[in-house]
């Protein structure tokens, strides 16, 4: 009997507004059948007959745009089906401008024990420029009220290399994060994605972004200052105080299987990567067990490549023994030449049969990852 995954992702696709950089599965909430969606989400969850989970993540979209009643309905239905004794981490994403006292109370009274706030920047002018509707003051207010409600495991997302952003602005954002004394932060370099406002502006020559060198300088500063303040740089974009690393996201980077539940959600079950129907109305019409629009049975080649791409994102890297036990092949035969080349370029370490990236490797991640693409003749 196949072992069931220990993690589940739930997708809430609704947003009160669309940010200029976002390409996630989302839809403006006005006029949407949100109550019906919550019920359909619950039905899909129940169809898996899950009894135990170690981590849960509710993301979006914007989960915090749900009313207190809608959120309570979802959280209660999830909790009723699970053995909460084995649930270690339950994260819900929120926007600083959406967190009402009623929503915070529902979160505090539930099994949720981690909140992820989409801050992006503390600079009000930049917030407006990237299409965010909250303000710096609302960030402080949300954090204060979450702490008062008993949440200590709070993480925020920040984006750097934004249009018109200077090094001084990045330093200010990191300093303000440190002043909040939160245990975790995810810092992402802006990536332009298709079908976004920013990509459309870029194609018309209307977007002024920091240079690649400036982007690298920003990342180096971030790594340095957070390390000096005790944060473990445990993944390319993630920094946590000891014990506050994201258990759920480590599931992804460890290339473990997980349930993906909701419109547009992706999952990984029994060696199959799948994606659910994206448009909300299409998702609602499908039966609970028939919501997938795409399935990909991963070849051994694809599984090995993903193991390297995902594993090397972690500071802890890839254990050679674990790799060989999982794939029943010689790591040295597959990747010996590439490892030697990357070590000589000071992009990788080989530390007692644990392959992991240097700080320089983190900066040039894609250059490292592409070295682990395999020719078909290897299998």
UniProtKB/Swiss-Prot annotation:
Keywords: 4Fe-4S, Cell membrane, Chaperone, Cytoplasm, Heme, Iron, Iron-sulfur, Membrane, Metal-binding, S-adenosyl-L-methionine. Belongs to the anaerobic coproporphyrinogen-III oxidase family. HemW subfamily. L.lactis does not synthesize heme, but is able to take it up from growth medium and to incorporate it into cytochromes. Residues 1-232 form the Radical SAM core domain. This is Heme chaperone HemW. The lineage of its organism: Bacteria, Bacillati, Bacillota, Bacilli, Lactobacillales. It holds the Pfam family HemN_C. PROSITE patterns: RADICAL_SAM. InterPro entries: Aldolase_TIM (IPR013785), Coproporphyrinogen-III_oxidase (IPR034505), Elp3/MiaA/NifB-like_rSAM (IPR006638), HemN_C (IPR010723), HemW-like (IPR004559), rSAM (IPR007197).
